[in-house]
């Protein structure tokens, strides 16, 4: 009972009025049904870390799954919050899902208090949302959500590589820590990207099982190219891929590396349109490099020079 009261107080302290459309980047934190008090405390701690980080970053925060006196189910509330989010196109939206998941070989579900939500249903709800999105599903059996929600505008993270990985997932604990962990900052730019946090969390998850002498039963994946396939941390050494994609295109990770919850000082000073243009140029350079073997050398070098000059001029004009 005491835990429930404390959770309600925390939820009320961050809950925004969903009837007001926020013009700021938004984070929706969904806390699923815990089942037992042990998981309730764990999920609460993970959620609190995300909430604290989002507030530090100045995000508009909405929490689903903590109200003790709600007049609607968590499923209804989640849909209402998503409907509201659709009214602010173009602004970053984070969706963090903390809890348990299930998979019956046909459909994956995220367990809520009351009726659950399936991957297919969530995909339908998100169709009107024209915003860059980062969706982090920390539940077991969460991989089918990556397939269902994949889109070029979205970065998707799941605790598991398949719906069959249904044991309790610990990835969420390490992800909630890594998102603001300076030791995860592999490129030393004084900010931890979503990609860097994913790599750190996935490796810490593997270390937990190894130290405990247990078989690794969860393999986190990240998709940011929109193909719904995703990559695992063991396909990279640091930020560098050690495998190639079958189609010759860059592996996932570039777009996720452009997502930062808490930005460094220089990035905070950049207008949104400048950051978006910079990210677009970086994407174009990466895609061009993947085509190096298929283009005439002169054409490749000419295109690369043009993009690099444009990026340098943009950074110089922004004072970087």
Residue ranges and their predicted role:
Residues 13-94, 101-110, 116, 134, ...:
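Boundary/activation segment at the start of structured domains
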Residues 118-129:
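Catalytic-core regions built around general acid/base machinery
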Residues 21, 37-48, 69-76, 112-120, ...:
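Soluble non-cytosolic domains of exported or imported proteins
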Residues 82-114, 129-170:
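Active-site microenvironments of hydrolase-like enzyme catalytic domains
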Residues 2-4, 13-28, 40, 214-320:
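Disordered regulatory segments flanking catalytic cores
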Residues 48, 134-233:
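Active-site-proximal C-terminal subdomain of hydrolase catalytic domains
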Residues 32-35, 44, 48-60, 83-90, ...:
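Sec-exported extracytoplasmic/periplasmic mature domains
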